[in-house]
Amino acid sequence: MLENVDSKDIPLNEENANFKRRKLINYSLILLGIVVLITTIIVVIYALNKEDQGEQKQESDFLNKIKANFVVNVSGSKTKLINIPFDKLNIHLFINDKETNFEYEYQFNGTGEYLVEFRFNEELTNLSSLFMDVINLKKIDLTGIVTDKVKNMDNLFKGCISLESANLNKINTFNVESMKSMFQGCNNLIKIDMENFITSSTKITTSMFENCYNLSEININFFNFTNIEDANSMFKNCYLLNQITLVNNNESSNTNMKSTFNECHSLKQLNLEKFGKKNIKEISFMFNNCYSLESIDLSKFDISQVTSIEYLFSNCSSLQSIDISQLNFNNVEYMGYAFRYCSKLTSIDLSNFNTSKAKTISGLFFGCSSLENISLNKFDIKITSIADLFNGCTSLKNVALKVDDVKHVDRVFNNCTSLEVLDLSEFNGLGIAFYINDFFPKIDTASIIYNSSIFGKNLEKRIPEGWNKTDINNQTN
């Protein structure tokens, strides 16, 4: 059989085998390449996914975010865009979405505005002085900040003179106890969104908005004064603020409201409809220079502990009516200039005006040019000074006054140009009460014993005809 085999078949079979072998190798290489490619893709996808998960995890570690706009206006010089005391906080700072150090110097020619985001890695319990004196802060949004355990917000934005708007709408202030000087000196601040601001736990609001000269709108349902102990100068010098609502449902707390609305020139209405009985311990200067205030009802204020009402309504030139008939003045010692320049006030009910502890009522009605009649003869007045008491009361026609052992009566009836009847039958001293007057009403002087310089200089020339001068003593000049 071997003899029948063609020798030419042998090379052909080997060639076929080699071809098949090469073909198999090529297929194997292609398959290996596909496997490598798939493996590479899987590895890349895994790596990308892991990196993304890492970023997400890092992102989840940021408990708080604050977004703010900063403005730089310099020319060819370096300036610090950010300089905020975050030394006790682990934060990440992003300027225009680029992470950087929290102190950031910037070389700039012209004017620029930068979006800055603060991300905190830890729980916040104190925001005191966080942005204080950051003078290039323009806008702030605290929507993303977690403040559940924050108790102190003192000086948070104090001195931020470029701040125009602040969104505090969604931050939790339930546990905040002190907001002293929170926005003090933000003199360009126009609007604050505090719609969901809760102050039920707050005790200190001293100077909270003081010197916010341009603040015209506070978007807040109400300020809850239930536990507030000190509101001294809270809205002082808020020239453009025209309306505010106060709420209180706790009679026990004693609150300092000295100068609370002092210099609120545009304040027309103080809404106290939901204001329960409130113990007040300081009230002087409370409405001083509130030129636009037309009426006020303080019947819900318990002032039994108050010792001074000095300048309480001074320069309230639009005030037409005031109800103080329910107020307890038993402990008030100082009443000086309380109604000074209330030029539209025509009458006032003083039936409950207890002056048993009063030491001075100087200038009490100074410049009340529309006041026509007043009676103080039922008062228990044992005071040292009534100087300027009715000075400038140009419409005053009838006065009854009872004062014992007073020492200072300077200008008490000065410029009372309409005065017709003056009952001084229980008055024992006039001093220089009419020092520069050229007119004199009908006066009963029977019991007057001390009248040094009552008419100023040239006494004899200035005493009106018909006066009873027989019992007048001590007429030295």
Where are these regions (language model features)?
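Disordered, charged N-terminal biogenesis/targeting segments of membrane/secreted proteins
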Residues: M1-E15, F235, F261, F390
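N-terminal capping/linker segments that flank leucine-rich repeat
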Residues: K8-N16, K20-K149, F222-N224, L246-N250, ...
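Structural signature of tandem-repeat unit edges
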Residues: Y114-E122, N136-K149, I161-E177, N187-K203, ...
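Register-specific detector for alpha-helical tandem repeat solenoids, activating on a conserved position
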Residues: S128-S129, D154-N155, K180-S181, T206-S207, ...
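Ankyrin-repeat helical core positions
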Residues: M132, F157-K158, F183-Q184, E210, ...
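Small/polar residue-rich beta-strand/coil "junction" motifs that cap repeat-based extracellular fibers
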Residues: L389, V412, D438-F440
